[in-house]
Each structure stands twice: as structure tokens, then as C-alpha cells.
């Protein structure tokens, strides 16, 4: 029958298209150097988020940052707006503390509550389009955001007051202007890469001869620290920010050794805790603080992690660390040594350089990653553009190895030097 249709001119072209579709096999070549130079130039100006997108899927990166395709903007209060409001409000609050006569250890509770409200108003005004908040649904969401911000400020202050680390910098912007080795990379004789970004918070603790640095990144989503994701290039931000903060701190404290203390995500939330109604207010507060514990990895030196939570017994409610009765670390503690921090740092730097070179070499493969039940397609808005379908020949996921043992991951990082 196909031969009959092909032999008739009025049907031949349609049949040809049908046969092409039926036996389609996806193939793809990298884009040429002339194209990459036109898109990116010889100096890549990158955010870390952009490189994480490249690690998830090179084609998605190409569409977003090369061709600069954008989703249609709608006049609505979206999750990204909530995240921006949280960040801006926390920045305004921190500036008020820094410019006042108080510290994070002495700020009165009534003033704390007042400044939260004012900082929230400042953040909303900074959004520009305040009309969107007049809608009933958005007014309700805004009240929830305010309640969450109040809980967040309470928790952040409680965490600070449990230790010796002091918030020293907020919304630290770094770029090529800072001439930091941590964010400037040579890809070839003619090509360079410069990273830009903003560190939400840098805390420091100063001993007699050392300064310890802790990074905190505020997240309104459910982002969890993963050493494996660092290994696969999917979660580079905290390590890059730590490298930049260590270099900036070293320039500030020229006579002291600067060491990494920890890298953390703080999940902005307003959790509910289980109980039977007999708990005291203090027990409830401790349970909430436990829910809002920093998520990340801590330096295993006792002097360092104890400076983040001075007098905890058993498990800390501030950091992911617990001690046995003899004072040794529990197996569940999320810790690494100073040397292992350097291992992560060196590995991430090599990964960044390799990614930059791949981008300039024209890598645009439609090969999203897959690891367990997660893929590079999960939150990608470009599926209708790439038409990725693993059932079609030539389309396939890039399978990433699942490694559970931290020591194995760190050994791999050392070996791939």
C-alpha cells in the first residue's frame, strides 16, 4: 500500500513525511566555534546556577543562556517572587541590625518583631508591581509569607545566639571586579570564565590565630545538601561561595589563617511539630528549632562545630551534628575534615573549568541526566522545544552513578585530579 501511495505524486510527499516520522532517529552535532563565540564571546560571564543547569542538560542551558528563550511572564504572585521577598526582607532586617546599637546577641524581642514588619514592607515595595498583592488570594499568601518570615528571623537569631560565630557579611556580591581567584578561571590562552553571584550570609569566628568561615544560603524550596550532587556537578553553589568567602576573608584578616567551618542551606519555612499537648513552650520552641536546623556539612574539628552550638547534648538543634556520651561524633553527623573541604574545593574548580570549555566547544546535547527518580527534565520549561522522548531512538538519559558512601565520593574527587 505504501508503494501505491508513493507512486502517486499527490500523496508521495505526505507518505515520505510519515515514513520519516515513523523511523525517526535523533542525531545531534555540537554547534560551531563561530556560533559559540557569537553567543558567548571569549569571556564566559556565568552564574553558578547556569553551570548547574549545564550539568543537568546541555541543551536546556543552550536554550536559556545561549538563545535566551524565556517563559511568558504572567502577572501573578509566583514561588520565585516569594523567594525574592524572603531574601530582600532578610537583607533589610540584617542592615537594620548592623546599623543599630544592638547586635544579634542583644536585639530585644519587641524591636525584632517591629523590624520584621518594616523589612517585609520594604521588600514588597522593592518588587515594583505592588498591585498584584491587592488580589485576595495574594493577600492571603502575603500573610503566610509574613508569618514565615517572623519564624525565620526568630530561628536565625536563636541559631546565632547558641554559638560564637557572628554574622559578618550579608548579600555579598562577587564578580570579576574583585579579582578573586575563586571566581576567575582560564579556559585557554584566549578564553576565560568569570563567575558572578551573591552569598546570602557569611559568619565568622575568630580565635587567637585563625578565622573560621561559615556560609549560609537561604532557600525557600526543599534543597538539601548532597555530596553526590557536587560530584556530578549538579550542586556547586555552596562550594564556590565558600571559596570566594575564604579568599575575601583572608584579604580582610591578613595576619591570620582562614579555615572553612561549614556550608549550609537554611530552609525558609514555618513548620508544625507533633505533640500530645503536654509540652512546655520551651520544648515546643526546641522542636521547631530542630525542624529548622541548618542543612549541610560541618568541619569535624570539635572546636569549630562546638563554636556553632556551645552547649548541646546529644544532637545539636542548630547544625547536623551529634555526639556520643564519650564526646566523639555520632555516625549520623554530617562532617568533613579541613583537608576534605579542600578536596571538594579543588574538584569543583576543575569541574567548573571543564564545563566552561565544553560550553565554548559548542556542547548542546539533548542528554538530560537521570539519577534514581530524578532527571534533568523535572523542572525544565523547554520540553516542547527539545521534544525529548526516551522511547525515540537517539534520545536517552545520561545515567549518573548513585554512590552512597561519602568516603567513596571524596576518594573519587581526589582521583580525578
Regions found by a protein language model. Name each.
Residues 1-417:
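Structural signature of nuclease core domains in nucleic-acid processing machines
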Amino acid at each position: 500500500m505504501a508503494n501505491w501511495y508513493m507512486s502517486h505524486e499527490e500523496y508521495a510527499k505526505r507518505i515520505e513525511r510519515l515514513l520519516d516520522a515513523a523511523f525517526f532517529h535523533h542525531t545531534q552535532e555540537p554547534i560551531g566555534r563561530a556560533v559559540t563565540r557569537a553567543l558567548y564571546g571569549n569571556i564566559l560571564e556565568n552564574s553558578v546556577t547556569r553551570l548547574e543547569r549545564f550539568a543537568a542538560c546541555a541543551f536546556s542551558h543552550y536554550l536559556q543562556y545561549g538563545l535566551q528563550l524565556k517563559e511568558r511572564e504572567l502577572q501573578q504572585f509566583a514561588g520565585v517572587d516569594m523567594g525574592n521577598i524572603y531574601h530582600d526582607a532578610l537583607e533589610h532586617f540584617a542592615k537594620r541590625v548592623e546599623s543599630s546599637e544592638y547586635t544579634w546577641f542583644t536585639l530585644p524581642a519587641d524591636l525584632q518583631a517591629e523590624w520584621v514588619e518594616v523589612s517585609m514592607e520594604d521588600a514588597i515595595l522593592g518588587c515594583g508591581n505592588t498591585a498584584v498583592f491587592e488580589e485576595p488570594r495574594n493577600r492571603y499568601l502575603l500573610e503566610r509569607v509574613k508569618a514565615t518570615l517572623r519564624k525565620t528571623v526568630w530561628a536565625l537569631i536563636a541559631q546565632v545566639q547558641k554559638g560564637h560565630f557572628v554574622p559578618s557579611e550579608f548579600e555579598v556580591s562577587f564578580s570579576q571586579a574583585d579579582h578573586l581567584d575563586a571566581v576567575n578561571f582560564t579556559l585557554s590562552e584566549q578564553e576565560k570564565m568569570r563567575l558572578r553571584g551573591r552569598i546570602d550570609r557569611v559568619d565568622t569566628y575568630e580565635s587567637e590565630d585563625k578565622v573560621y568561615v561559615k556560609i549560609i544560603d537561604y532557600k525557600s524550596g526543599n534543597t538539601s545538601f548532597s555530596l553526590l550532587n557536587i560530584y556530578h556537578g549538579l550542586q556547586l553553589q555552596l562550594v564556590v561561595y565558600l571559596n570566594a568567602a575564604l579568599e575575601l576573608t583572608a584579604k580582610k584578616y591578613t595576619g591570620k589563617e582562614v579555615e572553612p567551618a561549614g556550608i549550609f542551606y537554611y530552609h525558609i519555612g514555618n513548620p508544625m511539630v507533633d505533640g500530645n499537648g503536654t509540652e512546655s513552650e520551651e520544648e515546643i520552641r526546641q522542636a521547631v528549632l530542630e525542624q529548622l536546623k541548618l542543612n549541610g556539612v560541618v568541619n569535624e574539628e570539635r572546636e569549630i562545630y562546638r563554636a556553632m552550638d556551645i552547649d548541646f547534648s546529644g544532637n545539636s538543634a542548630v547544625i547536623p551534628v551529634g555526639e556520643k556520651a564519650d564526646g566523639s561524633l555520632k555516625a549520623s553527623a554530617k562532617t568533613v575534615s579541613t583537608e576534605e573541604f579542600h578536596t571538594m574545593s579543588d574538584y569543583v574548580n576543575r569541574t567548573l573549568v571543564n564545563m566552561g570549555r565544553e560550553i565554548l566547544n559548542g556542547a548542546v546535547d539533548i542528554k538530560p541526566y537521570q539519577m534514581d527518580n530524578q532527571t534533568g527534565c523535572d523542572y525544565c520549561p523547554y520540553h516542547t522545544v527539545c521534544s525529548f522522548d526516551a522511547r525515540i531512538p537517539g534520545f536517552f538519559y545520561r545515567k549518573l552513578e548513585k554512590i552512597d558512601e561519602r568516603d567513596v565520593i571524596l576518594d573519587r574527587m581526589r582521583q580525578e585530579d
